[in-house]
Amino acid sequence: MGQKVNPIGLRLGINRNWESRWFPTKQSLPENIGEDYKIRAFLKKKLYYAGISQILIERTAKKLRVTVVAARPGIIIGKKGQDVENLKNEVSKLIGKEVNVNIKEERKAQASAQLAAENVAMQLEKRVAFRRAMKKVIQGAQKSGAKGIKISVAGRLGGAEMARTEWYLEGRVPLHTLRAKIDYGVAEAHTTYGNIGIKVWIFKGEVLQKGVQPEKTEEEAPKKTRRARRGK
């Protein structure tokens, strides 16, 4: 199960929070979902080079607040914050409601799965060898403190006639462990040979309750050594 489903959706309410935070009525649910989709699609396309890792949308009775978490917030803010005001007006015009836009910096950009996937995609579009691109991203994630990272690329790799899937794994990525904090990101690289899909899983550690000690696995538990018997 953990190998197939989206690891973020599997852990919602356990160690991950929702990116859309609001309580709808039966009548407002379709409208709110449609507005959230429009906002995210617009911001991801317009601010692609700012390195967006998350877009959080919060609603109250009369207000709508959008928080953009980006690796390069200076590109979004602009001189004296003028670009943020223009962005706010464009989003408000898009959905026909007043919107408050906040910008936050992604402090550990190399440990963000979404940014890692987009980084690999950008390198593939620049004709960098896919193995080199994957290894570079893995090294960056490990330097940022990631406990494990897995990258999968699928498509006509290196211009091959037949599509295939290749993946690299460094450290450990326990997808079945619900207390494991795992970040997940996907991206597409548009190359002359066709589209290449990229998936990234980053394991950032385990979230434990206070006073609960993790059980030792067979690998961590001390192993008993057996003495070899001598023949008579």
Curated annotation (Swiss-Prot):
Residues 213-223 have a biased composition (Basic and acidic residues). This is Small ribosomal subunit protein uS3. Residues 211-232 are annotated as: Disordered. Belongs to the universal ribosomal protein uS3 family. Gene3D superfamilies: 3.30.300.20, Ribosomal protein S3, C-terminal domain. It comes from Campylobacter concisus (strain 13826). One of its GO terms (cellular component) is cytosolic small ribosomal subunit. Keywords: Ribonucleoprotein, Ribosomal protein, RNA-binding, rRNA-binding.
